[in-house]
Structures are given as structure tokens and as C-alpha cells.
Design a protein with these regions (language model features):
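Carboxylate/His-rich catalytic cores and anion/metal-binding grooves
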Residues: 1-6
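Amphipathic/coiled-coil alpha-helical interface segments used
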Residues: 7-81, 85-105, 110-177
Length: 177
């Protein structure tokens, strides 16, 4: 509900959740019990479901459990969006736009985090230094260090149509024999 109609139909959402499960180290059940805690924050800052699901793929694939990923991603999004935070102020200074404006313009999370990484590198800081909480810093660092995973997941989210039907057919064929 936090996304309104922008997340797509129930089938579209199901396709993306199954794709997240298939690419990451999580289950649809774990996502179902965790994602609701971060979706309002994501929606508030213009982070669409493809970006959010790709963040889950990347964090869980790289050893962060689903529930922890929720906490880390939520912390990261809050700091990126909260005026006065180092991350938010750096984005505004470098681009002239807020985090939400950057997301609304079509940038991905890794595009935005790449801007922060460049700024951190230029000032001799780490990505973790751009965030006040360890959780937010860990999420950001994981997404930047594994941007290839994130970008691959984003591509798969775009092509996820039919994933639910395929999964259903697999279950049907498995139980039929």
C-alpha cells in the first residue's frame, strides 16, 4: 500500500519477489515478513520496488540475513533522505538535488551511492564515514562493493514477467511425479 499503484499488479510484485528469492539468499516468506518495515521509507524517498528488491538480492547474496538487510537498508535510506545528514548533504552539494529528486529522476541506488563513494574517495574517507549508523554504512558499502550484483538484479527485475507462472509450473511438475 505504501507504493500506491506504482509497484504494479499483484502478479508484477510476485514476479519481483520470486526473482529476489532466486537471485539472493532469501525466501519469499522472509521478504514478506521483513519488507513491509522498509517499504514506507523507500516509497517516501522515491525508491521503487526494483531498486529495493535489488538491494535485498545484493545484501542477502553477500551474507546479510533478510531481517538484518531490512534494518540496514532502512537506515541507509533514512540517512540518504534526511536533510542534515552527511550523506544527504553530500548528495545535495554534489548534484544540487535531494536523494528523492535523484531517485525520481531515474537514478538507481548504486548510481546515487556511486556519487557518495566518489566524494568519500576524494576526501580520504570510507563509505562508512558518510553515514552516522554502522547499519546504514554497511548497507551502502555492500551495495557499492557489489554493484555488479545489484545492476544484474535490476536487469532481472525488468525481465521478471512470468517468473511466478514458471515457479508455479515447477511446483506442479514436481508434485505431479
Amino acid at each position: 500500500n505504501a507504493y500506491g499503484g506504482t509497484a504494479g499488479s499483484a502478479d508484477d510484485i510476485s514476479n519481483r519477489l520470486i526473482t529476489t528469492q532466486n537471485l539472493g539468499k532469501t525466501t519469499v516468506a522472509e521478504l514478506g515478513s521483513s519488507m513491509g518495515k522498509v517499504i514506507p521509507t523507500a516509497a517516501m524517498y522515491g525508491v521503487n520496488l526494483n531498486n529495493l528488491a535489488s538491494a535485498y538480492v545484493t545484501t542477502t547474496k553477500n551474507g546479510i540475513a533478510t531481517a538484518e538487510s531490512t534494518t540496514y537498508i532502512n537506515s541507509m535510506l533514512n540517512e540518504l533522505g534526511k536533510s542534515g545528514s552527511t550523506a544527504s548533504d553530500t548528495l545535495k552539494k554534489k548534484t544540487g538535488q535531494s536523494f528523492k529528486e535523484l531517485m525520481d529522476s531515474g537514478m538507481s541506488l548504486t548510481d546515487v551511492l556511486g556519487i557518495l563513494q566518489e566524494s568519500a574517495d576524494a576526501s580520504g574517507k570510507s563509505m562508512a564515514d558518510m553515514f552516522s549508523s554502522q547499519e546504514a554504512g554497511k548497507a551502502a558499502a555492500t551495495l557499492v562493493q557489489h554493484a555488479t550484483d545489484f545492476n544484474g538484479a535490476m536487469d532481472q527485475m525488468q525481465q521478471s514477467a512470468g517468473t511466478t507462472a514458471t515457479a508455479f509450473e515447477t511446483v506442479e511438475n514436481t508434485t505431479a511425479t
